[in-house]
């Protein structure tokens, strides 16, 4: 299936990846889908901001803990792109994200069941943002097949792979307009 892509969003994705590479010369780009529960939860427009803030806090706590343990820590700045979509069949709101993290610390999502892995932190942060129990609803954070791509500064092939995978976030067909909520966002600086 071919999609129409928003060129402004594609440019913002490109700029975000380039900014991330300016900060960290070796990155892991990780795709994740965040779904909403069928139970009452905090699913307002600010849920994605709460998620990002919760994930940043977990990353910071993880790095501080590793430092206290005397382990080498590579300071990381979380860069990200997100898109809000509505399912084509059921029309249910969900989010797609690409997270960019320093590869020296996270070369993959890690063990999906381990709370201290990057995947575990993502699941916990999403449940925290929603205000739901992480033990019961952690499957709302979904990782597609082969969610991670590595890239390095001056690696045109890796850069193109990341942009091609991230194009999915810039597709127009499943966005809702006129709702007062943003359909797309990315980290700044």
Describe the role of every protein-language-model region.
Residues 79-106:
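Histidine-centered divalent-metal-coordination microenvironment in nucleic-acid enzymes
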